[in-house]
Amino acid sequence: MDNLWGVLEEILNRHTYLADRLRCPEAIASQEFSKLSKEYAELKPKVELIARYKKLKEEQAYLELLVKNPLEDQEIREIGKSDLQAIQDVIPKLELEIKRMLLPKDKDDALNVMLEVRAGTGGDEAALFAASLFHMYQKYAERMKWRFEIISISHNEIGGYKEANASISGSDVFAKLKFESGVHRVQRVPETESAGRIHTSTATVAVLPEPEDVDVKINDKDLRIDVYRSSGPGGQSVNTTDSAVRITHIPTGIVVIQQDEKSQHKNRAKAMKVLRVRLYEIERNKVQQEISSMRKSQIGSGERSEKTRTYNFPQGRITDHRINLTTYRINETVKEGELEPIIEALIRENEARMLAGVEVGFSGDKS
């Protein structure tokens, strides 16, 4: 920790500067007051952690002198040894917490996300699994008190989802969900299986950070917007007005279709939101490729690796192949959205790999 004291002192000094600055009348009246207040609030828990650590180190130094002092009363020295041991047990945990605090943060962690779930291999069973995953994330969002807004759902004939999209907003949504991207696999006996055989199906999950409006500039001249009547299953028209919207981004060829709303205006707004997310993801991927060597130690960067997680219903087991984590609470996870233990394990493992500087890729191909 000795080599980190300079960094910790910088944090303390910055916090002191901000406190003084925010007390100035001219700062309160300035446009940067909100920005300074936010930075001050973000530094506060870090400063409290550093202060606690410094206090313990001072107590440790005092007790070390106390227990070594031959002139001190023996009973006092024994009490000092006990107190010293308690402090020595706590300090390594605090040091780890401080190191985690100093890890570089993903600038997108605080952003809301666009969730995309698509049925993969496995026909109708894959579509049913995609629906289960979508509802799992919806339940998890409820647990986290996030807002879950369904953008669009494409059903199949038996109630499964060919594709489903949702916007999730709240506190640190991308930080929590970014490791969910990838191929999810299910092993279970389909309802339509009369012989009781276990089938394996897949669904892909993509978690894309939603940029702020200022992060993505879209020129109107780069867009081709078509409107038409929305259609339901089988292609029949379900609306008498041209409410469906198809937006084509000419430079990239990205096409977004939105027809869930009865209002053309609402469909256009949703389509533009999806387009903005996809354009931001393209730019984000470019940046990630440029710094890929720095990210090798992480759990994943949101790429769709083959076999991220397996849900084995006959055994009641969920296995995350990236960190060899197995849990036997499959119903609580899938049906009730109890995802937090898995997500926290992924975050902690990612932090551990970053702290250790271990250059390991994340292929997700372990069985």
Swiss-Prot record:
<keyword id="KW-0648">Protein biosynthesis</keyword>
<dbReference type="Pfam" id="PF03462">
    <property type="entry name" value="PCRF"/>
</dbReference>
<dbReference type="InterPro" id="IPR005139">
    <property type="entry name" value="PCRF"/>
</dbReference>
<keyword id="KW-0963">Cytoplasm</keyword>
<dbReference type="InterPro" id="IPR000352">
    <property type="entry name" value="Pep_chain_release_fac_I"/>
</dbReference>
<dbReference type="InterPro" id="IPR050057">
    <property type="entry name" value="Prokaryotic/Mito_RF"/>
</dbReference>
<dbReference type="InterPro" id="IPR045853">
    <property type="entry name" value="Pep_chain_release_fac_I_sf"/>
</dbReference>
<protein>
    <recommendedName>
        <fullName>Peptide chain release factor 1</fullName>
    </recommendedName>
</protein>
<dbReference type="GO" id="GO:0005737">
    <property type="term" value="C:cytoplasm"/>
</dbReference>
<dbReference type="Pfam" id="PF00472">
    <property type="entry name" value="RF-1"/>
</dbReference>
<dbReference type="InterPro" id="IPR004373">
    <property type="entry name" value="RF-1"/>
</dbReference>
<comment type="similarity">
    <text>Belongs to the prokaryotic/mitochondrial release factor family.</text>
</comment>
<feature type="modified residue" description="N5-methylglutamine">
    <location>
        <position position="236"/>
    </location>
</feature>
<keyword id="KW-0488">Methylation</keyword>
<dbReference type="GO" id="GO:0016149">
    <property type="term" value="F:translation release factor activity, codon specific"/>
</dbReference>
<comment type="function">
    <text>Peptide chain release factor 1 directs the termination of translation in response to the peptide chain termination codons UAG and UAA.</text>
</comment>
